[in-house]
């Protein structure tokens, strides 16, 4: 039987579900992705059945990855109820701006399957003759038209209906007890599929829908319809590699690139490749400097919106993700996952070159540059290159003199956070690195590696000149300069000649740095205000007192060093001989006995010294200075210990006593000579 054709106007606006910004923010990422798929699929289906019009703004925004919310919220006042809509049906057809699409009854039902999220199981062969009544399963009532069959089927799938929704047929309302709209016998058109489409397309919903099968809540009916269709239908696009299925073939194609390794989008600047175009677009902003997302609080800009959202949590103080092990909180879930690996020891990122594993992907990326020899981060001041940006940033502070990291204990400042963290261990006594051979704990990993070499009992690095062996190559390099006479710098102000380049740089900074702060009492000038405060304490106050002996100090670091004499703590260990020291400067001076370094050279006679104190005393020979005077006889001396020994003559003190013959001595040297006489 030939069916009568009728026309209905269908525009994309009829199928569009709009969100305000507030509503959009309430959707989780899965719901947003679902909305995107629904809208793009509806638009594609309309185009496939002959819909021709310029691309709507919402589709353009979705394709560009932008948020599709509208400025003003729609209300039900923009849409008439079902009776008014039917009365104005002809007027809508006449004034509609979009192209009219013609359907037969059979084609209409089939196309509605595609347009409305594939929720109906009625195909072309599923449409019976008009002579045969249709049966609705829930109540067993007979229905006379296709429209009531379609409505009844939808009612069966979703029985929880918001009060504000009016897009239902008369028969479905009889099941649900809804009598909001009266049935008018004069309007026979209400039993046609035309009215069904109009019923469903002109509604706007304020209340969310609950879907009984999966428990999800949706704010718009179009999303609910598609969700039901996805749970009841098999996805035809399946990946042959991992059997994962996708609702769209384009999504499957992008997914398969993970297995094939295909990256068709190439950056014209650095030739880096990407699987999807959006990743390339985001990457290109690194080269162009474009940072379109700006923080309204601090005006900081970002390349992508996700980085901005994470940053904004800093201003709000919100740290939503807490570690169950240590209670530490994080702004991002990914940061928590990375942190948790520090508890589990998991290192999922492995280098294919050497097998070294890392807990973070960024660490692996930086490590791989060591194999390629790639150092992309270059200092504009000196041309030195680095593997990672953070190392370059720390290096640039050498040129600027900036030391933003300050120790709260001793006010010492550092170029980078890691150096400060290592320094703090000298105050806390923390030694997190344990030697597996002897169980000894050390402050830094580098110190542990250097210590483990001593267990091998082998000094691998030999000096070609004198045959001396060293455990470390760096120590050998410093030692060899004693033979070559290589000296990195001479500065007349201090008279120091440095064999170690780092020491030379330190001395240079000390001598050339501009002095900004001057002491009003002595005229002593220093480069930092904190140094001036410490200097003034030597005159007026000594606020730091030792609890053991009551001795006072003007600096907290000096007190810390002194307290080690009571605790016996000696944190500085020589890698060559294993000797330990309380203070770092003593440790540094001791190392020169192994390297042979003598950085302090006299300008008068050319004699050089390991220790600065010895050099200072030697200089007094040329200047004739004797600052230490005896109060008893007025005799003067160049060294303090010489004065101390001399004063024993006036006091009669003889502190050194022989255990064999009980003879006493004023000087230790004489006492040692005497003891040898007993051994002989």
UniProtKB/Swiss-Prot annotation:
It comes from the Eukaryota. InterPro entries: KRAB, KRAB_dom_sf, Znf_C2H2_sf, Znf_C2H2_type. One of its GO terms (molecular function) is RNA polymerase II cis-regulatory region sequence-specific DNA binding. Pfam families: KRAB (PF01352), zf-C2H2 (PF00096), zf-C2H2_6 (PF13912). Gene3D superfamilies: 6.10.140.140, Classic Zinc Finger (3.30.160.60). Disulfide bonds: none annotated. One of its GO terms (cellular component) is nucleus. A zinc finger (C2H2-type) spans 237-259, 265-287, 293-315, 321-343, 349-371, 377-399, 405-427, 433-455, 461-483, 544-566, 572-594, 600-622, 628-650, 656-678. One of its GO terms (biological process) is regulation of transcription by RNA polymerase II. Belongs to the krueppel C2H2-type zinc-finger protein family. PANTHER family: ZINC FINGER PROTEIN, ZINC FINGER PROTEIN 345-RELATED. May be involved in transcriptional regulation. This is Zinc finger protein 334. It comes from Homo sapiens.
């Amino acid at each position: 039987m030939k069916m009568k054709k009728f026309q209905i106007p269908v525009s994309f606006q009829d199928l569009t579900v709009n969100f305000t910004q507030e509503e959009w923010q309430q959707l989780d990422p899965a719901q947003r992705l679902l909305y995107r798929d629904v809208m793009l699929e509806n638009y594609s289906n309309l185009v496939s059945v002959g819909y021709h019009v310029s691309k709507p703004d919402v589709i353009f925004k979705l394709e560009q990855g932008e948020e599709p919310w509208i400025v003003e919220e729609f209300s039900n006042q923009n849409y008439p109820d079902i009776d008014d809509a039917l009365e104005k049906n002809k007027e809508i057809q006449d004034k509609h701006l979009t192209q009219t699409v013609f359907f037969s009854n059979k084609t209409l039902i089939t196309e509605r399957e595609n347009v409305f999220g594939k929720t109906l199981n009625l195909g072309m062969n599923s449409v019976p003759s008009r002579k045969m009544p249709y049966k609705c399963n829930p109540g067993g009532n007979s229905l006379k038209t296709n429209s009531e069959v379609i409505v009844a089927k939808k009612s069966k799938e979703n029985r929880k209906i918001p009060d504000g929704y009016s897009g239902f047929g008369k028969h479905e309302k009889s099941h649900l007890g809804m009598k909001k709209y009266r049935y008018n016998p004069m309007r026979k058109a209400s039993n046609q599929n035309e009215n069904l489409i109009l019923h469903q397309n002109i509604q706007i919903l304020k209340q969310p829908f609950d879907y009984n099968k999966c428990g999800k809540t949706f704010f718009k009916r179009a999303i609910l319809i598609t969700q039901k269709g996805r749970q009841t239908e098999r996805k035809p696009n399946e990946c042959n590699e991992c059997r994962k299925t996708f609702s769209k073939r384009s999504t499957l194609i992008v997914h398969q690139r993970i297995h094939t390794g295909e990256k068709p989008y190439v950056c014209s600047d650095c030739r880096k490749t990407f699987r999807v175009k959006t990743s390339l677009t985001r990457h290109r902003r690194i080269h162009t400097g474009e940072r379109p997302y700006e923080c309204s609080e601090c005006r900081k800009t970002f390349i992508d919106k996700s980085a901005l959202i994470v940053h904004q949590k800093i201003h709000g103080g919100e740290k939503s993700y807490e570690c169950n092990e240590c209670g530490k909180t994080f702004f991002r879930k990914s940061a928590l996952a990375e942190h948790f690996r520090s508890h589990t020891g998991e290192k999922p990122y492995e280098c294919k070159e050497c097998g070294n594993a890392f807990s973070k992907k960024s660490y692996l990326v930086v490590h791989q540059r060591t194999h390629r020899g790639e150092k992309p981060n270059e200092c504009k001041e000196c041309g030195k290159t680095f593997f990672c940006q953070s190392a370059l940033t720390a290096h640039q502070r050498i040129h600027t003199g900036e030391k933003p990291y300050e120790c709260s204990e001793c006010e010492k400042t550092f170029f980078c956070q890691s150096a400060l963290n290592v320094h703090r261990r000298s105050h806390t006594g923390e030694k997190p690195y344990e030697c597996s051979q002897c169980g000894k704990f050390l402050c830094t990993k580098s110190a542990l590696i250097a210590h483990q070499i001593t267990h091998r009992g082998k000094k691998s690095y030999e000096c070609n000149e004198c045959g001396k062996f060293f455990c470390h190559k760096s120590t050998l390099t410093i030692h060899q300069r004693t033979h070559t006479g290589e000296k990195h710098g001479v500065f007349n102000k201090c008279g120091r000649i440095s064999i170690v380049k780092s020491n030379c740089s330190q001395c240079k900074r000390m001598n050339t740095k501009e002095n900004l702060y001057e002491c009003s009492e002595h005229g002593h000038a220093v480069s930092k205000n904190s140094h001036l405060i410490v200097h003034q304490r030597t005159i007026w106050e000594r606020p730091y007192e030792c609890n053991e002996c009551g001795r006072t100090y003007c600096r907290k670091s000096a007190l810390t060093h002194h307290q080690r004499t009571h605790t016996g703590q000696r944190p500085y260990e020589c890698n060559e001989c294993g000797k330990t020291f309380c203070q770092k400067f003593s440790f540094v001076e001791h190392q020169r006995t192994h390297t042979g370094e003598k950085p302090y050279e006299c300008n008068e006679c050319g004699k050089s010294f390991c220790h600065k104190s010895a050099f200072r005393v030697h200089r007094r020979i040329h200047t004739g200075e004797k600052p230490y005077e005896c109060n008893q006889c007025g005799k003067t001396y160049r060294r303090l210990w010489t004065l101390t020994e001399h004063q024993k003559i006036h006091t009669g003190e003889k502190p050194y006593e022989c255990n064999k013959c009980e003879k006493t001595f004023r000087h230790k040297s004489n006492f040692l000579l005497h003891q040898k006489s007993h051994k002989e």
